Amino acid sequence: MDIDIVSVFPEYFDVLNLSLLGKAQERGLLAVRSHNLRQWTHDVHQSVDDTPVGGGAGMVMKPEVWAECLDELLGIPADAPANAHAAPAADSPVLIFPNPSAPLFTQQDATALSHAEHLVFGCGRYEGYDARIPQYYRERGVDVREYSIGDYVLNGGEVAVSVMLEAITRLLPGFMGNADSIVEESYTGENALLEHNQYTKPASWRGIDVPPVLISGDHGRVNRFRRDEALEKTSRLRPDLIARLDCHALDKQDRKTLMSLGWEVSGEHPRKLED
Protein backbone atom coordinates (compact mmCIF):
# COMPACT_ATOMS: atom_id res chain seq x y z
CA MET A 1 0.00 0.00 0.00
CA ASP A 2 1.23 3.50 -0.88
CA ILE A 3 0.36 6.32 1.51
CA ASP A 4 0.89 10.04 0.92
CA ILE A 5 0.21 12.56 3.68
CA VAL A 6 0.01 16.31 3.07
CA SER A 7 0.47 18.65 6.02
CA VAL A 8 2.05 21.96 6.98
CA PHE A 9 3.77 19.95 9.73
CA PRO A 10 5.10 16.86 7.90
CA GLU A 11 7.59 16.15 10.69
CA TYR A 12 4.61 15.23 12.87
CA PHE A 13 4.53 11.92 11.05
CA ASP A 14 8.05 10.87 11.96
CA VAL A 15 6.33 8.79 14.64
CA LEU A 16 5.12 6.45 11.89
CA ASN A 17 8.64 5.05 11.69
CA LEU A 18 8.23 3.52 15.15
CA SER A 19 6.84 0.19 16.33
CA LEU A 20 4.80 -2.03 14.00
CA LEU A 21 4.24 0.72 11.42
CA GLY A 22 7.97 1.23 11.12
CA LYS A 23 8.62 -2.49 10.83
CA ALA A 24 5.90 -2.83 8.18
CA GLN A 25 7.65 -0.16 6.11
CA GLU A 26 10.98 -1.91 6.51
CA ARG A 27 9.39 -5.13 5.25
CA GLY A 28 7.85 -3.39 2.25
CA LEU A 29 4.21 -3.87 3.29
CA LEU A 30 3.58 -0.16 2.87
CA ALA A 31 5.36 3.02 1.87
CA VAL A 32 4.54 6.23 3.75
CA ARG A 33 5.53 9.63 2.36
CA SER A 34 4.79 12.91 4.14
CA HIS A 35 4.77 16.16 2.16
CA ASN A 36 4.90 19.79 3.23
CA LEU A 37 2.00 21.64 1.61
CA ARG A 38 4.13 24.81 1.49
CA GLN A 39 6.26 23.08 -1.15
CA TRP A 40 3.53 23.98 -3.66
CA THR A 41 3.35 27.69 -2.79
CA HIS A 42 4.87 30.43 -4.95
CA ASP A 43 5.00 33.51 -2.72
CA VAL A 44 7.82 34.56 -0.45
CA HIS A 45 5.78 33.85 2.67
CA GLN A 46 4.72 30.37 1.49
CA SER A 47 1.11 31.22 2.33
CA VAL A 48 -1.39 28.37 2.46
CA ASP A 49 -4.39 30.24 3.90
CA ASP A 50 -6.52 33.34 3.43
CA THR A 51 -9.44 35.11 5.10
CA PRO A 52 -12.93 33.55 4.88
CA VAL A 53 -15.22 34.77 2.10
CA GLY A 54 -18.22 36.37 3.77
CA GLY A 55 -16.26 37.28 6.88
CA GLY A 56 -15.68 35.44 10.11
CA ALA A 57 -12.88 34.46 12.43
CA GLY A 58 -9.77 32.53 11.49
CA MET A 59 -8.21 31.60 8.19
CA VAL A 60 -9.15 29.05 5.51
CA MET A 61 -6.70 26.90 3.54
CA LYS A 62 -6.47 28.06 -0.08
CA PRO A 63 -7.71 25.79 -2.88
CA GLU A 64 -5.02 26.71 -5.43
CA VAL A 65 -2.18 25.45 -3.22
CA TRP A 66 -3.99 22.22 -2.42
CA ALA A 67 -4.87 21.74 -6.09
CA GLU A 68 -1.26 21.91 -7.28
CA CYS A 69 -0.28 19.42 -4.60
CA LEU A 70 -3.14 16.98 -5.16
CA ASP A 71 -2.92 17.16 -8.96
CA GLU A 72 0.65 15.91 -8.64
CA LEU A 73 -0.01 13.21 -6.04
CA LEU A 74 -3.19 11.95 -7.72
CA GLY A 75 -1.81 12.16 -11.26
CA ILE A 76 -4.59 14.45 -12.51
CA PRO A 77 -3.93 17.10 -15.20
CA ALA A 78 -4.62 20.65 -14.04
CA ASP A 79 -7.05 21.08 -16.95
CA ALA A 80 -8.92 17.81 -16.39
CA PRO A 81 -12.60 18.32 -17.28
CA ALA A 82 -15.35 17.75 -14.75
CA ASN A 83 -17.47 14.65 -15.18
CA ALA A 84 -20.34 14.42 -12.72
CA HIS A 85 -20.96 10.79 -13.68
CA ALA A 86 -17.35 9.61 -13.45
CA ALA A 87 -16.87 6.62 -11.17
CA PRO A 88 -13.51 6.04 -9.46
CA ALA A 89 -11.45 3.22 -10.96
CA ALA A 90 -10.92 0.24 -8.68
CA ASP A 91 -7.18 0.89 -8.41
CA SER A 92 -7.35 4.70 -8.26
CA PRO A 93 -6.11 6.59 -5.17
CA VAL A 94 -8.52 7.36 -2.34
CA LEU A 95 -8.36 10.97 -1.13
CA ILE A 96 -9.17 11.36 2.57
CA PHE A 97 -9.73 14.55 4.57
CA PRO A 98 -10.35 14.58 8.34
CA ASN A 99 -13.30 16.87 9.03
CA PRO A 100 -15.18 17.27 12.35
CA SER A 101 -18.38 17.86 10.35
CA ALA A 102 -18.08 14.56 8.47
CA PRO A 103 -19.44 11.07 9.24
CA LEU A 104 -17.69 9.14 12.01
CA PHE A 105 -14.77 6.95 10.96
CA THR A 106 -15.53 3.34 11.95
CA GLN A 107 -13.87 -0.06 11.98
CA GLN A 108 -15.87 -0.88 8.86
CA ASP A 109 -14.32 2.11 7.09
CA ALA A 110 -10.87 0.99 8.19
CA THR A 111 -11.52 -2.49 6.81
CA ALA A 112 -12.73 -1.16 3.45
CA LEU A 113 -9.78 1.22 3.09
CA SER A 114 -7.28 -1.51 3.98
CA HIS A 115 -7.97 -2.98 0.52
CA ALA A 116 -6.98 0.22 -1.32
CA GLU A 117 -3.66 0.40 -3.14
CA HIS A 118 -3.02 4.11 -2.63
CA LEU A 119 -4.30 6.48 0.06
CA VAL A 120 -3.74 10.24 0.03
CA PHE A 121 -4.48 12.09 3.30
CA GLY A 122 -4.92 15.86 3.47
CA CYS A 123 -4.45 17.52 6.87
CA GLY A 124 -6.47 20.68 7.33
CA ARG A 125 -5.49 23.50 9.68
CA TYR A 126 -6.94 26.80 10.94
CA GLU A 127 -10.67 26.99 10.07
CA GLY A 128 -10.23 24.08 7.68
CA TYR A 129 -9.88 23.76 3.91
CA ASP A 130 -11.91 25.45 1.19
CA ALA A 131 -15.02 23.29 0.59
CA ARG A 132 -14.44 23.44 -3.16
CA ILE A 133 -11.38 21.19 -2.87
CA PRO A 134 -13.20 17.88 -2.21
CA GLN A 135 -15.96 18.96 -4.61
CA TYR A 136 -13.45 19.57 -7.42
CA TYR A 137 -11.84 16.15 -7.14
CA ARG A 138 -15.12 14.29 -6.77
CA GLU A 139 -16.22 15.89 -10.03
CA ARG A 140 -13.12 14.44 -11.67
CA GLY A 141 -13.79 10.88 -10.62
CA VAL A 142 -11.64 10.76 -7.48
CA ASP A 143 -12.89 8.69 -4.54
CA VAL A 144 -12.96 11.49 -1.95
CA ARG A 145 -13.86 10.68 1.64
CA GLU A 146 -14.23 12.94 4.64
CA TYR A 147 -14.28 11.52 8.15
CA SER A 148 -14.57 12.68 11.73
CA ILE A 149 -12.92 10.73 14.55
CA GLY A 150 -15.30 12.07 17.21
CA ASP A 151 -17.56 14.87 18.36
CA TYR A 152 -14.78 17.31 19.15
CA VAL A 153 -12.45 19.68 17.30
CA LEU A 154 -8.65 19.45 17.09
CA ASN A 155 -6.06 22.03 16.02
CA GLY A 156 -5.43 20.17 12.78
CA GLY A 157 -5.92 16.95 10.88
CA GLU A 158 -2.60 15.35 11.79
CA VAL A 159 -3.86 13.53 14.89
CA ALA A 160 -6.94 12.27 13.05
CA VAL A 161 -4.85 11.03 10.12
CA SER A 162 -2.57 9.15 12.52
CA VAL A 163 -5.59 7.49 14.11
CA MET A 164 -7.11 6.45 10.79
CA LEU A 165 -3.78 5.35 9.38
CA GLU A 166 -3.07 3.02 12.29
CA ALA A 167 -6.59 1.56 12.20
CA ILE A 168 -6.24 0.86 8.46
CA THR A 169 -2.68 -0.42 8.19
CA ARG A 170 -2.88 -2.89 11.08
CA LEU A 171 -5.44 -4.79 8.99
CA LEU A 172 -2.98 -5.37 6.13
CA PRO A 173 -1.98 -9.03 5.67
CA GLY A 174 1.31 -9.65 7.44
CA PHE A 175 1.20 -6.43 9.48
CA MET A 176 0.37 -8.08 12.81
CA GLY A 177 2.64 -10.79 14.15
CA ASN A 178 -0.42 -12.89 14.98
CA ALA A 179 -3.34 -12.32 12.61
CA ASP A 180 -5.74 -13.96 15.11
CA SER A 181 -5.21 -11.04 17.49
CA ILE A 182 -7.58 -8.83 15.47
CA VAL A 183 -10.35 -11.40 14.99
CA GLU A 184 -12.13 -10.84 18.32
CA GLU A 185 -11.37 -7.15 18.77
CA SER A 186 -14.05 -4.59 19.48
CA TYR A 187 -16.15 -3.53 16.47
CA THR A 188 -14.84 -6.41 14.33
CA GLY A 189 -17.22 -8.34 12.08
CA GLU A 190 -20.78 -7.79 10.91
CA ASN A 191 -22.24 -8.47 14.37
CA ALA A 192 -19.69 -6.31 16.15
CA LEU A 193 -19.47 -6.19 19.94
CA LEU A 194 -17.03 -4.63 22.34
CA GLU A 195 -14.25 -7.06 23.18
CA HIS A 196 -14.42 -9.07 26.40
CA ASN A 197 -12.09 -8.09 29.25
CA GLN A 198 -8.49 -9.29 29.12
CA TYR A 199 -6.37 -10.64 31.99
CA THR A 200 -2.85 -11.98 32.42
CA LYS A 201 -0.85 -13.65 35.20
CA PRO A 202 -0.88 -13.78 38.18
CA ALA A 203 -4.37 -15.18 38.63
CA SER A 204 -4.67 -13.28 41.91
CA TRP A 205 -3.32 -9.74 42.17
CA ARG A 206 -3.72 -7.41 45.16
CA GLY A 207 -6.78 -9.27 46.32
CA ILE A 208 -8.49 -9.32 42.92
CA ASP A 209 -8.88 -12.69 41.20
CA VAL A 210 -9.41 -13.35 37.52
CA PRO A 211 -12.76 -15.02 36.77
CA PRO A 212 -12.28 -18.70 37.79
CA VAL A 213 -13.69 -20.02 34.50
CA LEU A 214 -10.68 -18.60 32.65
CA ILE A 215 -8.31 -20.97 34.47
CA SER A 216 -10.66 -23.97 34.32
CA GLY A 217 -9.09 -25.41 31.17
CA ASP A 218 -12.58 -25.85 29.66
CA HIS A 219 -12.30 -23.99 26.34
CA GLY A 220 -16.03 -24.22 25.65
CA ARG A 221 -16.90 -22.57 28.96
CA VAL A 222 -14.18 -19.96 28.45
CA ASN A 223 -15.55 -19.03 25.01
CA ARG A 224 -19.09 -18.82 26.36
CA PHE A 225 -18.00 -16.69 29.31
CA ARG A 226 -16.17 -14.29 27.02
CA ARG A 227 -19.12 -14.05 24.65
CA ASP A 228 -21.52 -13.31 27.51
CA GLU A 229 -19.11 -10.76 28.95
CA ALA A 230 -18.87 -9.05 25.56
CA LEU A 231 -22.66 -8.90 25.32
CA GLU A 232 -22.97 -7.47 28.84
CA LYS A 233 -20.19 -4.95 28.31
CA THR A 234 -21.62 -3.79 24.99
CA SER A 235 -25.13 -3.55 26.42
CA ARG A 236 -23.83 -1.36 29.24
CA LEU A 237 -21.42 0.86 27.34
CA ARG A 238 -22.59 0.84 23.71
CA PRO A 239 -26.25 -0.24 23.54
CA ASP A 240 -26.40 1.18 20.02
CA LEU A 241 -24.21 -1.72 18.88
CA ILE A 242 -26.55 -4.27 20.46
CA ALA A 243 -29.47 -2.65 18.64
CA ARG A 244 -27.72 -3.30 15.30
CA LEU A 245 -27.25 -7.03 15.85
CA ASP A 246 -29.09 -9.50 13.63
CA CYS A 247 -31.32 -11.55 15.93
CA HIS A 248 -31.24 -14.43 13.45
CA ALA A 249 -27.46 -14.69 13.92
CA LEU A 250 -27.75 -15.04 17.72
CA ASP A 251 -27.56 -18.48 19.31
CA LYS A 252 -29.81 -19.67 22.14
CA GLN A 253 -27.43 -18.55 24.89
CA ASP A 254 -26.92 -15.15 23.23
CA ARG A 255 -30.66 -14.62 23.34
CA LYS A 256 -30.87 -15.75 26.95
CA THR A 257 -28.07 -13.40 27.97
CA LEU A 258 -29.57 -10.43 26.16
CA MET A 259 -33.01 -11.10 27.62
CA SER A 260 -31.46 -11.11 31.11
CA LEU A 261 -29.99 -7.70 30.28
CA GLY A 262 -33.40 -6.31 29.35
CA TRP A 263 -33.44 -6.80 25.58
CA GLU A 264 -36.30 -8.08 23.43
CA VAL A 265 -34.86 -10.45 20.80
CA SER A 266 -37.90 -11.67 18.89
CA GLY A 267 -37.65 -9.19 16.01
CA GLU A 268 -35.05 -8.51 13.34
CA HIS A 269 -32.86 -6.54 15.75
CA PRO A 270 -32.74 -6.47 19.57
CA ARG A 271 -34.87 -3.82 21.24
CA LYS A 272 -34.21 -2.45 24.71
CA LEU A 273 -37.21 -2.85 26.99
CA GLU A 274 -38.25 0.05 29.17
CA ASP A 275 -37.09 -0.19 32.79
Swiss-Prot record:
Keywords: Cytoplasm, Methyltransferase, S-adenosyl-L-methionine, Transferase, tRNA processing. It comes from the Bacteria. GO terms for biological process: tRNA N1-guanine methylation. The keyword S-adenosyl-L-methionine applies. Its main location: cytoplasm. It is found in: Cytoplasm. GO terms for molecular function: tRNA (guanine(37)-N1)-methyltransferase activity. Pfam families: tRNA_m1G_MT (PF01746). This is tRNA (guanine-N(1)-)-methyltransferase. It comes from Bifidobacterium animalis subsp. lactis (strain AD011). The lineage of its organism: Bacteria, Bacillati, Actinomycetota, Actinomycetes, Bifidobacteriales.
